[in-house]
Regions:
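Intracellular loop-helix junctions on the cytosolic face of multi-pass helical membrane proteins
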Residues: 7-57, 181-189, 193, 198, ...
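A gly/Pro-rich, aromatic-decorated transmembrane alpha-helix motif that marks the paired
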Residues: 74, 115-116, 201-213, 425-441
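Short amphipathic helix-loop junctions that connect adjacent transmembrane helices
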Residues: 74-98, 292-312
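Central cavity-lining transmembrane alpha-helices of secondary-active solute carriers
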Residues: 104-119, 317-330
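C-terminal ends and interior cores of transmembrane alpha-helices
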Residues: 136-150, 356-373
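Hydrophobic core of transmembrane alpha-helices in multi-pass small-molecule transporters
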Residues: 152-168, 374-395
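Intracellular juxtamembrane helix-capping segments at the cytosolic ends
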Residues: 167-182, 395-408
Length: 493
């Protein structure tokens, strides 16, 4: 999962962010959040060689927050198509295309709002206060979903969750990096391992439990949405408890905006934007697997496989399990083996990943054609599609994130992070808009329902991958390493 993601893929960024903050000259000064608040450390202890004391609070917070988000997301589209009520207490569910449209619009908002989170954090409030304030907003979003099962509760809840979840995304991982100085920077890989584990563990458990609560008549939507809300409240309290343990890097004001609009900054973003257009199409497909259209398809599958019985919303559990297996497999086995025959670089990995993503949708397209013909295919076929999709994620998402940071000027790391997340927003905005247009397209003779829907995305991804191969050959970038002069380099080096 992108718990991503996008937080889960940050080993490079954590180290870059640490060096970035420590390379800027700052005079230690106190931050007060109230008239009687104690003074907080504003720079890492460079002599500290053990784990920073605030790290356990950040890891606990992240695991609980990811539980809340992915638990809610795993049941969202099924709630809209099966359980949604009107103000009179009667069922008023959405059609599949309408539910998919709102689902992707919500995901698009979640990954658009990190831009504002980065601006608020870096320019005004700092990371700690930004995370605390927006986490409270996040909690109220879960409360609205749990307490009101009408469209009012749905849209109010999703709006608040998008603001809270999206706003804190660029802050949390940077806050981890802020805790480390030169004396303990060697512990970053270990911290990232626990950080990454907490994210995937939280998403795995919630994706398993929340569908059970939703489908059990003793509980239903109120408990299914209430459990993620409770975990978000716990996440907020845990983070607040660590306030005296954290290093609080002060906001730098809006001076970084000048760097953003400098010639070098605009040129770097312009170069990355060429790659990001293709990555946005990747996310347009990927997010259909995480509680979206693939979950709706799973409702029509034979959910018994290898002695196990799945709920439709639980099939997506395959992704976090597989990504944990694939990252070491790709890094230590597959990439070195391919590199001996065909030299790999960042853009080549991304290109291969785009083709693999298309292959996953070939499987989904075939499954849907069997369903449309009256069949009931085994869920094992969708699990095969998850294997291919997760392989493409390892090649595109992780590689693209690390590539972005090395291509970003040293003072623009946070903004480039927000720009990377914006590709997710663009991809989901496209998918959401397309779903809303399906009824109108039908009236004009264009059928994008059933197997034709997945056929469209399969061809879209294939065409995108082919064009990317040619465009990537002409990409020339500049690599920026903290503490060193920027180096002209081919993008793939």
């Amino acid at each position: 999962m992108r718990p991503y993601l996008l937080l889960k893929n940050f080993p490079v960024w954590l180290s870059i962010r640490t060096m970035s903050d420590s390379s800027v000259s700052r005079q230690p000064q106190a931050i007060r959040v109230g008239p009687s608040s104690p003074k907080y450390r504003t720079t890492p202890d460079q002599a500290l060689t053990r784990m920073p004391p605030g790290v356990p609070y950040i890891i606990g917070n992240e695991g609980a927050e990811r539980f809340s988000f992915y638990g809610m997301r795993s049941i969202l589209i099924v709630f809209m198509t099966t359980y949604l009520m009107n103000a009179s207490g009667q069922l008023a569910t959405m059609a599949k295309n309408e539910a998919a449209g709102w689902f992707h619009t919500f995901v698009s908002a979640v990954y658009f709002l990190p831009i504002f989170g980065a601006l608020i954090s870096d320019g005004l409030l700092g990371k700690y206060r930004t995370i605390i304030y927006l986490s409270i907003v996040y909690c109220f979003g879960h409360l609205a979903l749990a307490m009101n099962d009408t469209r009012l509760g749905l849209f109010l809840g999703l709006g608040l969750i998008a603001l809270g979840s999206g706003g804190i995304k660029p802050c949390v991982s940077a806050h981890v990096g802020d805790q480390f100085g030169q004396g303990n920077s060697h512990l970053l890989p270990r911290v990232f391992g626990w950080f990454y584990f907490s994210i995937n563990f939280g998403s795995f458990i919630s994706t398993y439990l929340c569908p059970i609560l939703l489908n059990d008549p003793r509980f239903g939507p109120r408990y299914a949405f209430g459990l993620p809300g409770l975990l978000m409240l716990i996440a907020t309290v845990v983070f607040w408890m660590g306030r005296k343990k954290f290093v609080h890097i002060q906001p730098g004001g809006l001076g970084f905006v000048r760097e953003f609009f400098s010639r070098e900054g605009l040129e770097a973003l312009g170069r990355l934007a060429i790659v990001y257009v293709f990555v946005a199409v990747f996310w347009s497909l990927w997010d259909q697997s995480a509680g979206g259209e693939w979950t709706l398809q799973a409702k029509s599958l034979d959910l018994h496989f290898l002695g196990l019985t799945f709920l439709p919303e639980q099939v997506q559990i395959a992704n976090p399990i597989l990504i944990l297996l694939f990252i070491p497999l790709f890094n230590y086995v597959l990439y070195p083996a391919i590199d001996r025959v065909f030299p790999l670089n960042a853009l080549r990995k991304i290109g291969i990943g785009l083709f693999v993503m298309a292959s996953s949708f070939v499987v989904i397209w075939w499954i849907q054609s069997q369903i449309d013909a009256g069949g009931k295919p085994s869920v094992g076929w969708q699990l095969l599609a998850y294997v291919l999709l997760t392989a493409s994620e390892a090649m595109v998402s992780i590689t693209g994130l690390e590539f972005s940071y090395t291509q970003a000027p040293r003072k623009m790391k946070s903004m480039v992070m927000a720009a990377w997340l914006f590709t997710v927003s663009l991809g989901n905005a496209f998918t959401g808009a397309l779903n809303f247009l399906i009824p109108a397209l039908r009236q004009h003779g264009f059928n994008l329902e059933g197997a034709a829907y997945f056929q469209f995305f399969t061809w879209l991804m294939l065409v995108t991958a082919v064009i990317f191969v040619f465009v990537a050959r002409f990409y020339r970038g500049k690599t920026y390493i903290q503490g060193e002069a920027s180096m002209d380099a081919a993008a793939a080096s």
